[in-house]
Regions:
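Predominantly flavin-linked oxidoreductase catalytic cores and closely associated redox partners
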Residues: 1-102, 138-139, 154-157, 161
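Active-site proximal loops enriched in glycine and acidic residues that flank catalytic Cys/His/Asp
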Residues: 71, 134-136, 179
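Flexible, glycine/charged-enriched surface loops at secondary-structure junctions
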Residues: 99-110, 168-174
Length: 194
């Protein structure tokens, strides 16, 4: 990743805690109309994981009988035989989840690594010629498993800071202050140390 190269080159992690990571697996399902409730949200933690393994799930009912279901597992798990994919499959067979998926069909799927360090892992965000935003900056609200709104806000604040200093050929340090004064920073502070 370019971000990791930049963080090392400009020592952007000098004053923050190390980033932690998880793997997120997500599927999109088309389910039976009788199993669908538009707008319904289900979040879980734990099962089928053991008590030493951090993780949880989400299930979001969209319109047109579509459901997004996902499972996130912290990558610091101790069991070398643990398979995030297998844990996700087991999770989908829990009666409280299976009832939504029965008779449905999976339309798409994907997986990705997630930054989960949160507030205490936010690096220095600026360096000569650039700014870290979104996921690269570690902006993720872990309990809500949401980061798109934070990525968008950081991009907007970056644009403002760049616009204000576009004629200067210096590091845009204003951006870090804009982040610290924004609701983004407050939101991450409230869910720190999770």
């Amino acid at each position: 990743h370019l971000g990791k190269i930049l963080m090392k080159k400009f020592d952007l992690n000098a004053n923050n805690q190390p980033q932690t990571y998880a793997i997120g697996i997500k599927e999109l399902w088309e389910i039976k109309p009788e199993n669908h409730t538009a707008g319904k949200i289900v979040h879980t933690t734990g099962w089928p994981l053991n008590t030493d393994t951090y993780g949880g799930s989400f299930l979001y009912h969209f319109d047109k009988n579509l459901v997004s279901i996902g499972f996130v597992i912290g990558l610091d798990y101790k069991n070398p035989y643990l398979s995030p994919y297998d844990e996700f499959q087991q999770f989908k067979h829990h009666p409280q989840i299976k009832k939504y998926l029965d008779g449905g069909r999976r339309i798409s799927y994907g997986a990705r690594a997630l930054n989960e360090g949160g507030y205490q892992s936010i690096p220095k965000l600026t360096f000569p010629g650039g700014i870290l935003v979104g996921c690269e900056a570690g902006f993720l609200n872990v309990p809500k498993i949401k980061g798109t709104h934070l990525a968008m806000k950081s991009g907007m604040l970056a644009a403002e800071a760049i616009f204000e200093d576009i004629d200067k050929e210096t590091e845009i340090i204003k951006f870090q202050n804009k982040i610290k004064k924004s609701w983004l920073y407050k939101e991450l502070f409230l869910v720190r140390n999770i």
